[in-house]
């Protein structure tokens, strides 16, 4: 797995970044033989599952599941943390939250988000089925917590996977709604991601029919177009999708939740009190 951090230094007023190789071949993150296919822009990559043991309560052990690509190549990094952001198979997990000052960087963020969402959703469904779930009862076996909007595609992606298992769209939406909850951490724009439809269509064309249907469904619940999943400019509001299609929305503290209810997300609160 590749380094996800950088060391920042300054010399003569110039900031420089160097990779911090904190994650090495001797890491506690153990590779497994489990891989999940993930379609990125019509091209399939294989996300390998890594497991990291985490000390738990009363001597018990929890497991943190991580994913990476075998094709990642750190040698493409030059001049600190510069690399070709379009060479997805080599750079996808090199750096978390890469520079998004250009279109390539913004697309890379969506690629990163979908890799983790798709692989994670496939793992959740597989583990729940192994424990006896028939997927119709997924909410009895799993709880998916959406922290901010970075993993918001964990709503349409499980719907897609459930449809592949023969479950009708309307039921798949209800299953995902019952399984997912959303926590809003801040009202700042960077935590309320909005992606152009054209960007998502490049990265996850397989999700676009589902997102379109979710927007249609949300519009049947309210005449307030400000609450739509897709706005009049063709931008997809990830937080709106989260609120419409999860069973619970909260802030990180009681005061924050009250602010969301009374001001920032008041329209949604009136729709879903």
Predicted regions, residues:
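A conserved ligand/cofactor-binding region detector
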Residues: 1-273
């Amino acid at each position: 797995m590749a380094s996800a951090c950088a060391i920042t230094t300054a010399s003569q007023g110039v900031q420089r970044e160097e990779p911090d190789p904190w994650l090495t071949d001797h890491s506690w993150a153990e590779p497994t033989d489990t891989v999940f296919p993930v379609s990125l822009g019509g091209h399939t990559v294989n996300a390998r599952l890594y497991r990291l043991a985490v000390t738990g309560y009363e001597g018990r052990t929890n497991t943190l599941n991580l994913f990476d690509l075998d094709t990642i190549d750190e040698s493409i990094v030059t001049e600190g943390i510069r690399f070709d952001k379009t060479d997805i198979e080599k750079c996808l997990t090199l750096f978390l939250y890469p520079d998004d000052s250009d279109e390539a960087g913004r697309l890379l963020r969506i690629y990163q988000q979908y890799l983790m969402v798709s692989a994670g959703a496939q793992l959740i469904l597989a583990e729940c089925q192994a424990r006896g779930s028939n997927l119709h009862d997924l909410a009895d076996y799993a709880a998916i917590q959406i922290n901010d909007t970075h993993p918001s595609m964990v709503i349409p992606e499980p719907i897609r996977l459930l449809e592949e298992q023969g479950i009708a769209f309307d039921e798949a939406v209800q299953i995902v709604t019952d399984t997912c909850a959303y926590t809003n951490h801040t009202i700042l724009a960077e935590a309320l991601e909005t992606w152009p439809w054209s960007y998502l269509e490049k990265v996850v064309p397989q999700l676009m029919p589902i997102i379109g249907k979710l927007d249609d469904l949300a519009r049947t619940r309210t005449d307030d177009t400000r609450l739509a999943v897709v706005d009049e400019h063709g931008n997809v509001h990830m937080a709106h999708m989260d609120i419409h299609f999860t069973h619970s929305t909260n802030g990180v503290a009681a005061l924050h939740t009250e602010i969301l209810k009374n001001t920032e997300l008041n329209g949604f609160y009136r729709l879903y009190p």
